[in-house]
Amino acid sequence: MSSEDLSAPGPSAPDSSWSSTGPSTKFELERETELRLEVEGTDPVRVELVSGLAEVFGTELTRNKKYTFPPGSRAAIFTWHGCTVQLWGSPDMAYVSRDTPMLLYLNTQVGLEQMRVQAEREGERGPRVLVAGPSDVGKSTLCRLLLNYAVRRGRRPTLVELDVGQGSVSVPGTMGALCVERPADVEEGFSAQAPLVYHFGSTTPGTNIKLYNKLTSRLAHVFNLRCDSNRRASVSGCLINTCGWVKGSGYQALIHAASAFEVDVVLVLDQERLYNDLLRDLPHFVRTLLLPKSGGASERSKECRRESRDQRVREYFYGPRGSLYPHAFEIKFSEVRVYKVGAPTIPDSCLPLGMSQEDNQLKLVPVTPGRDMAHHLLSVVPLDGGSAEEGIEERSVAGFIVITGVDTERQTLTLLSPAPRPLPKCVLLIMDIRFMDLK
């Protein structure tokens, strides 16, 4: 088995479509309005575009096709010219709003496209855009919208995901990049066939800010190499999604990301103070814009965030529609090497001479297999020569596994894996993230 196999779970089963039953509601949307949906509870909601033109976060809807939004979904169906939408099910919230920032977002896209045209004409690079703002203001949604609009114009932009708590490119606890070649699927998002993913190990950058900044620099370096060899990627530029930590070390991480990627444009959502701070601290040639958040962006509870992270991991193993079948098998303790990136903080007086706490943050600490590893998510980092510990924290991962069981008597681990045994020659990096496989 090659290491690439880990990125694609096993054979798929026929999709079982959900029948259009339950209460039905028809919405007549006027031009430049949007139907906002929030789906909680346990039942999905289905939507169909009956007439007119409409889109979801920049992806055009196909007329007379039913789209399913599962529990936990939040969506906005926007129309530039007016449309009729049929809805089946009982969402927690469904209303039409005229108060939308879509015209401002479209103007932003027009400006970015003008920069791409100029880059094409003058042999320069395209716009590198960093999207910043506190939590729950719609940063990921704005990135998705601008990426979709760029692709619809024939571009091939790169999505750079620095939000370790969300994981739109891969699972939570990772950082990564994805070349976007087609608009996001309304139900499943962007196709992640060959993402570049790095292990971080936690959902909060503050747990290891040294590693976070190092991986940010690594992503920027790899993106620069791609732009050097691919003119279309260079002209198309990138959209960088950041986390909602915008104070203290979080703010410094934003400045570091802007510097590492040499961004041309910074879009700040819904926080004037952050906008003014970045305007002051970034180079004068960086265009910094303040944009309003959508009225549909609302604060999520800790429970909602946890469920969203669980869903992202579940989708990795089982697919967005639950139609994939991962593999379960046992391996012996002696067959694996497990590490954690970053040693526990200890007093400076106890550190070796000349070593700092920051050095400690990048140290690989061996983890002895035991019961406390149960249900942890682990990154699979393939070994292609060299020592096991050499630069492991900067290597891209091949995929992920979950330890579903630990037998200390038999010295075995039971794994949930998207690919069958055996594991490739690899090192496993353990995350703080746990996943209970209840399927």
From Swiss-Prot:
Residue ranges, compositional bias (Polar residues): 14-24
EC number: 2.7.1.78
Name recorded for this polypeptide: Polyribonucleotide 5'-hydroxyl-kinase Clp1
Record bears the keyword tRNA processing: yes
Gene that specifies this protein: clp1
Family annotation (PANTHER family): CLEAVAGE/POLYADENYLATION FACTOR IA SUBUNIT CLP1P, POLYRIBONUCLEOTIDE 5'-HYDROXYL-KINASE CLP1
Assembly: Component of the tRNA splicing endonuclease complex. Component of pre-mRNA cleavage complex II (CF-II).
InterPro entries, per the entry: Clp1, Clp1/Grc3, Clp1_C, Clp1_C_sf, Clp1_N, Clp1_N_sf, CLP1_P, P-loop_NTPase
Localisation: Nucleus
Residues holding ATP: E34, R74, D136, V137, G138, K139, S140, T141
GO molecular function, one term: ATP-dependent polydeoxyribonucleotide 5'-hydroxyl-kinase activity
Highest rank taxon of the organism: Eukaryota
Gene Ontology cellular-component terms listed: mRNA cleavage factor complex; nucleus; tRNA-intron endonuclease complex
Primary localisation category: nucleus
